[in-house]
């Protein structure tokens, strides 16, 4: 029997006590028939922690549980999607949860609510959505006091958290995670979605909680973004291959402009100029040089107005985060980068 909702969960080293809050938060959803819900869990390899059968069968909705060959989080997300039967799908991390008992009721209501979207430049009323993006909550810890805090993630387009998709839309457009991407992989799927539809609803009220976990590398290592910046460029390269193969050139030009300007302002930040980060900066610049060599033609084709809009947003972000002044002009940066390739 096909379901209305499929909640797709990659799983590796999360024991029962860690994944239980997620499954519990689904079980307490109100005004939703539990027969309409399935959770699809995919274990990443034979060394993944085995979830007991009696534990999974204790829930009032169906759970598919699959042990897959060792790969990575993107492959597990794709595998779970392939197993799913729901009309609408969403991905959730095994160590997160829904923090409101009305999350699925709200999303289902929005699948039946009309909205206006521009189709060929004409405002058109459509029912439901191809994608629903929402604010989500992030749980954090004060590094000095250990005190818990929560913040609204309103700019979370680089995350998959709190997003629902019409399954048929994803299948029809061949939208998937990149199988060889395991870091900064979420923005790949989000870019594909935005390139294929304007039928995206925005929910300003959060219902997904990105929980704190003590061994989370991405939030505990202060050098995480510097160490993984080449992975961000790799994800962008994958997106550009996908977009150009689909002849989505306007979106591809925006992506190149975004990464190019992000690299420029990021490398101007004082934190990238310390002895501690020199190794990461050198590696990231060499990786970006190869990227820019491949996609420079799209940068050159991107309208100046688009570049200016993107530049303004990124520069404002970096100033807020501590950049005082550009240490070189954009032209100087690009000329220097070209000499690295």
Question: Predicted segments — roles?
Answer:
Residues 3-6, 25, 38, 188:
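Cell-envelope/extracellular polymer assembly enzymes that use nucleotide-activated donors
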Residues 14-30:
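Short, well-formed alpha-helical segments that are part of the catalytic scaffolds
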Residues 35-46, 64-69:
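Short beta-strand/loop segment that forms part of the nucleotide-sugar
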Residues 41-52, 93:
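A conserved acidic beta->alpha catalytic loop
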Residues 65, 115, 272-341:
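Membrane-interface aromatic/basic loop that binds lipid-linked glycans or pyrophosphate carriers
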Residues 68-84:
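Glycine-rich, basic loop-to-helix element that forms the pyrophosphate-binding segment
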Residues 73, 94-203, 208-227, 247:
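Donor-binding/catalytic cores of nucleotide-activated saccharide
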Residues 89:
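Short aromatic/hydrophobic "clamp" motif used to bind/position activated sugar donors
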């Amino acid at each position: 029997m096909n379901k209305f909702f499929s909640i797709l969960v990659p799983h590796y080293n999360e024991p029962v006590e860690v994944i239980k809050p997620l499954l519990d938060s689904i079980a307490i959803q109100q005004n939703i028939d539990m027969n309409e819900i399935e959770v699809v869990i995919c274990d990443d390899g034979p060394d993944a922690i085995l979830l007991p059968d009696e534990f999974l069968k204790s829930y009032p909705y169906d759970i598919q549980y699959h042990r897959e060959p060792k790969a990575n989080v993107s492959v597990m997300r794709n595998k779970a999607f392939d197993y799913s039967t729901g009309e609408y799908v969403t991905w959730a991390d095994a160590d997160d949860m829904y923090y409101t008992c009305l999350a699925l009721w709200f999303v289902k209501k929005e699948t039946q609510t009309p909205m206006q979207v521009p189709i060929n430049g004409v405002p058109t009323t459509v029912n439901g959505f191809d994608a629903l993006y929402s604010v989500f909550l992030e749980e954090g810890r004060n590094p000095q006091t250990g005190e818990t805090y929560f913040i609204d993630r309103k700019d979370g387009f680089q995350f998959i958290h709190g997003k629902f998709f019409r399954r048929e839309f994803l299948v029809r457009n061949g939208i998937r995670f990149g199988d060889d991407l395991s870091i900064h992989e979420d923005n790949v799927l989000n870019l594909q979605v935005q390139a294929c539809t304007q039928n995206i609803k925005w929910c300003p009220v959060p219902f997904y909680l990105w929980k704190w976990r003590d061994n989370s590398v991405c939030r505990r290592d202060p050098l995480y973004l510097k160490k993984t910046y080449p992975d961000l460029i790799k994800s962008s390269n994958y997106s550009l291959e996908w977009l150009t193969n689909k002849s989505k050139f306007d979106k591809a030009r925006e992506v190149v402009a975004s990464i190019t300007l992000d690299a420029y302002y990021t490398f101007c930040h004082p934190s990238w100029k310390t002895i501690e980060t020199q190794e990461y900066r050198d590696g990231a610049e060499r990786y970006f040089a190869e990227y820019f060599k491949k996609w420079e033609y799209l940068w050159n084709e991107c309208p100046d107005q688009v570049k200016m809009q993107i530049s303004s947003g990124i520069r404002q972000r970096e100033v807020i985060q501590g950049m005082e002044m550009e240490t070189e002009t954009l032209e100087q940066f690009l000329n220097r980068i070209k000499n690295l390739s």
